[in-house]
């Protein structure tokens, strides 16, 4: 008789939690909430202390401080009690300064340490001290993971310790922490760490770092800009060229890391799609550090020369919209996220958002008589919404050497599969019984399969006939759906192409690829285009999804309710039959079978240009899927991060002048880094045969390595190569 299964020791853990309390083991499964997750991390750190010979129970450790930071905004009672317990311990217990070893991963990492300042700093400090200057204190920087938990998109966790005294050169106000001039405040890390857990789970920590360049805005004003290209849409047949809209252009810039290429290199993605079966999006955090602010002046000599000087008093404005009060503007749909190459400086995109503008455009074709109805309405006063960051979001001022951390945001999203389905409706359920089987190698059963079609048993929904065939037998549901494609609907703000979920169809013709809804991406040198290619024409690719949605437009037909065999031309509608008096238009262009019986997978991750997460609509009836991103945040999504150079004014500033204010030309370079955590399930093999995996041929290999002048590109990679059955 097998021994009884060994149960994990639960200890003194209150109901509703798995790790918040003493005396339990570390194999309790997934934490129940952010406070429980913080407790699990705290317990793992304590275990590391004990393995290294230190007793964390008698001292206040960095792990205790990390737990305090992560639970300071806790809304559950257990998190609040734990938070105040360790605050009390902090007040009475001696400090344990040494940090525990990090848990091992497939790529070992070292704890983040402050780099030592250069020797001339100490020489300067000694001179200033001798002259009577105050003693400069060095602030102790915690690693980025010490930021506050942000389960509801709360306020950013910024380090407010600032160095004081004249030796640092960056004293004064500001919302971020300060490392001081000449002292590094962070690390450059673009490693992807794979931590293999129990029961086939893998924790994937994607680290990303970029040098970000930011120029001062052209204007300090918000502008309402209306785009009007009625000259093009006034021509018959040009409805799809309509670009009329209104937008608010702001002086702010958006730091957007919401694209797969920001986080994973091609080798990482190959490993993930070849070995994992599904992805869970766990948490996200980001930080700005090592801020550099410089002014530009131009000499009066001929030819003029530019002089660049560090400005220790200029400010970088940083705002985190943690409560999602501003319009959500993911930049991946415009290919304007942070760049995909870690060693190349990148720029944040100018932030703008849509403003309401009514528009009427009546469809026409080249043979239409008369001028198209092409009305340029304007903004409805009832729908005016003008947002400003300055009075909606806390703004932090950073100077040279300062830093800013957002804290950790925990996602609430459904998982994303990394497998595709091959089954359509014709491959669901039990196949028909065969009376005879082939007797020779390679032989095929031709003709009748053993039982006359009108004598078979089973279930159909066909009236007026007793025939049961593979075409007429009733299946449990509809795999995929027929969607209108090349279909434009009219809204009060103009026509728009209706989105459809991507899926592989039948024959690979241009017509059918469009019908399958496969997205087509256009991008520049920051996002995968060959870096040495000249010209402004973007590079493009069409992502053909592996999953099968059951669409095959050129083979669809509709049969009359009075089912007749054979059918005549008056009781069947074929793809070649005219619709509305026009020929060559499939009924699939206008027919939608998406309904309560439809079975459909989520959209695939599109590496590297695809969007990762999206915001849930604030509507009562919500879409079940979004076509831009596989992860849809159920409650809140990470706050958008905005940056802007504060106005660096001259003595000629006149508040009554109508022209742009007089400013010193200023720009900033700062380092951005982030951490995006996933959990993935290892893919188990259930078939005898091996399967196709992500690989490359000899010619494609050289896309991923630099040429003799440094040219390289990123080729898109499939994400759902492994097949699976869905029924």
From Swiss-Prot:
It is found in: Virion; Host nucleus. Keywords: Capsid protein, Clathrin-mediated endocytosis of virus by host, Cytoplasmic inwards viral transport, Disulfide bond, Host nucleus, Host-virus interaction, Magnesium, Metal-binding, Microtubular inwards viral transport, T=1 icosahedral capsid protein, Viral attachment to host cell, Viral penetration into host cytoplasm, Viral penetration into host nucleus, Viral penetration via permeabilization of host membrane, Virion, Virus endocytosis by host, Virus entry into host cell. Residues 19-64 are annotated as: Phospholipase A2-like. Its main location: virion. Residues 1-40, 95-120, 141-184, 503-535 are annotated as: Disordered. GO terms for molecular function: metal ion binding; structural molecule activity. GO terms for cellular component: host cell; host cell nucleus; T=1 icosahedral viral capsid. GO terms for biological process: clathrin-dependent endocytosis of virus by host cell; microtubule-dependent intracellular transport of viral material towards nucleus; symbiont entry into host cell via permeabilization of host membrane; viral penetration into host nucleus; virion attachment to host cell. Disulfide bonds join 633-637. Pfam families: Parvo_coat, Phospholip_A2_4. Belongs to the parvoviridae capsid protein family. The N-terminus of VP1 is sequestered within the mature capsid. It contains a phospholipase A2-like region and nuclear localization signals that might be exposed by capsid modifications during virus entry. Capsid protein self-assembles to form an icosahedral capsid with a T=1 symmetry, about 22 nm in diameter, and consisting of 60 copies of two size variants of the capsid proteins, VP1 and VP2, which differ by the presence of an N-terminal extension in the minor protein VP1. The capsid encapsulates the genomic ssDNA. Capsid proteins are responsible for the attachment to host cell receptor TFRC. This attachment induces virion internalization predominantly through clathrin-endocytosis. This is Capsid protein VP1. It comes from Canine parvovirus type 2 (strain Dog/United States/780929/-) (CPV-2). The lineage of its organism: Viruses, Monodnaviria, Shotokuvirae, Cossaviricota, Quintoviricetes.
